[in-house]
Amino acid sequence: MDADSDWRSAPFRQKLVSQIDEAMRKAGVAHTKSSKDMESHVFLKAKTREEYLSLVARLIIHFRDILNKKSQAAATDPMNALQNLTGTAVVGGQGMGMGVRPQGAQMGAMSGMAQMAQQMNLPGQPQPGASGMAPHGITGVAAGNQATQLQLQQIAQHQQQQFQQQQQQAALQHQQQQFQVAQQQQFQVVAVAAAQQQQQQQQQQQQQQQQVQQQQQQLQAAAQQQHILKLQLQQQQNQQQQLQQQQQQQLQRIAHLQQMQQMQQQQQQQQQQQQQQQQQPPPQQVMQLQQMQQQQVAQSQQQQLLSTQPQAPSLVAQGQIPSQVMPVTLTPQQQQQLKILQQVRAQQQQQAQHQAQQQAQQQAHQQAQQQAQQQAQQQAAQQQAQQAAQQAQQQAQQAAQQQAAQAHLAAGQVTQNSIPVMSSPSPVQQVQTPQPMPPPPQPSPQPSQPMSQPNSNVSSGPAPSPSSFMPSPSPQPSQSPASARTPQNFSVPSPGPLNTPGNPNSVMSPASNNQSEEQQYLDKLKQLSKYIEPLRRMINKIDKNEERKKDLSKMKSLLDILTDPNKRCPLKTLQKCEIALEKLKNDMAVPTPPPPTVPSTKQQYLCQPLLDAVLANIRSPVFNHSLYRTFMPAMTAIHGQPIASQLVVPRKRKFEEDERQSIPNVLQGEVAKLHSKFLVNLDPSHCSNNGTVYLICKLDDKNLPSVPPLQLSVPADYPDQSPLWMDNPRDYEANPFLQSVYRYMTSKLLQLPDKHSLTALLNTWAQSIRQACLSAA
């Protein structure tokens, strides 16, 4: 069993109960509780071994104190005790045995008892120290009573034993107290050490918690930084994507512009080449004709050899044979046909050279007529070039649609059509055909001049009508000029009427209409480009308005039509868009384009850009507001506040006395137009004999503090002269706030122009008070 819990055991408690019982018995105290009850009460009250032992020790000491008090009371009267002992020896002995004295009292009693014994043993002989005892009546005691002597000796021995026991108990108690004090000190030291350790542990725990919190804060800061970095990266990626999209859009626009420029350059080059060809002599025309024929022959051969599907028939130059699309695979018969075509084209080239020589001989006689027809031929050549280009596109689409119908007709058939170039009929043209042919075009004095176009197989020869390219349902065998020289006959569709440049009765083909519509579309789109920016502003303005969602969708579709080149709409739709934009013109505030300026040879005026800007925006509904907002501050700084004058000229008075009024009309009108916070009255302390008006102005503004009124003098020739402030420094020396108002007022008056109005002066006064309030705050 542990030392801390052995005090709870029954033997240990029984031992202490016996000690308490012995102490009670020695003290001779009659108590209602027994020693066991007292011990159980102490046991229940104590919580530790030390507390239990200390309570039991106090109980035993209490009984011993009672015993000591009784022994002291018995020792104060020894003669009475001896008399009691002579009567009842046994009872006296018991009574003496119950008393406990201090050490000095016990020794005195013992010496007295010894002296008494000596006197008893030797009667009649006085002993030293016994003379003081005679008055107490010891002489009356029998000297020969031996029983009494024995009793006294027993009592003395018993007292000595008790004294020794008391000394031993006192020593034990002293040792126990020292032991308890030492234990308490040890417990205190241990408790202090434990408390210090606990404090250290708590401090360490707090430090660890602080470190953990710091680490958590660092982790949170790192996480926030990572989140911020992620957001920055996302923003950078979004910006890069936007930049890439913008760059792609710009590249697309640049590519579109480059294509348009290339097309324009090609058209210009074609026109220049046409003009050069018209101005060149006939030998140069022959050389160009030969080169074009050779190039087109080579191109037609490559197309026929490499084509995998039927293609649209192309227009050829004068003297060439337009051929239909060859089938996908070339048979030996088709190869022979190609050779025959090459031979025919070579013969036609020779004929063209012969005809060119004849034309050169006749050119001297035809110069007068040539000059008259030259302009008409140039226009016709340009129109035919445009028609040929558009017809080629249309025919390509038609050929793609009719691919299935022409598949069984394309095999073994080669369409040929000879176009006369010479003015006089050649032997080839004089060959008769079984089928009646349309009359050949009338020979013109000036031969039709070919028009070469780069990178195209379109020539300026006569443009056959669309019917010439469509195979007839039941083609009749006809003998072409080439068939007169070849053993084979080819079935060809009946040619339609030919329109040559020299034929004044030639009909315009649908291609010219398409070209004109294209030009009109581009012009209209360019005309409507002025609505793009106002339309965007209008869309941004009503984007958040849910009530105008329909208008918003319409506006967005209009903007897409005007800005997106990929969205192509008919010309009629574009005209409807123009009508809708005209209706929205007032809402969008579209600036009207300035009138076309006539280029002048003189030096440009210095303010011409400003005048142009004014002319461009003069019809805008916000023009006057913009002018007022732009120029009004500068004009106010130069001339001061505007003064509202009476426009109605006052009638002249009959008498001079009536002409001089007390208050001028200008001043009355200005005072009437003042803000309601300014209360203006005439100063009764001054008399205006010379026309000067003295006023007292008060400020009634709930947002500003109350200040002394302002005294003003308005001269008679106001507004030619400015009003004056009759400053009185005494009114503004009451407190620092009024002093600051006075300083600000004097400084602001110096900033006013030389000519200023009463309104400007009062506004300056209110501004000074407001500025003083701000500085005081």
Swiss-Prot record:
Major localisation: cytoplasm
Biased composition (Low complexity): 420-434, 449-471
Keyword Cytoplasm found: yes
Domain of life: Eukaryota
A GO biological-process term: regulation of DNA-templated transcription
Region (Disordered): 120-139, 418-520
Location in the cell: Cytoplasm; Nucleus
Role played: Component of the Mediator complex, a coactivator involved in the regulated transcription of nearly all RNA polymerase II-dependent genes. Mediator functions as a bridge to convey information from gene-specific regulatory proteins to the basal RNA polymerase II transcription machinery. Mediator is recruited to promoters by direct interactions with regulatory proteins and serves as a scaffold for the assembly of a functional preinitiation complex with RNA polymerase II and the general transcription factors. Required for cholesterol-dependent gene regulation.
UniProt name for this protein: Mediator of RNA polymerase II transcription subunit 15
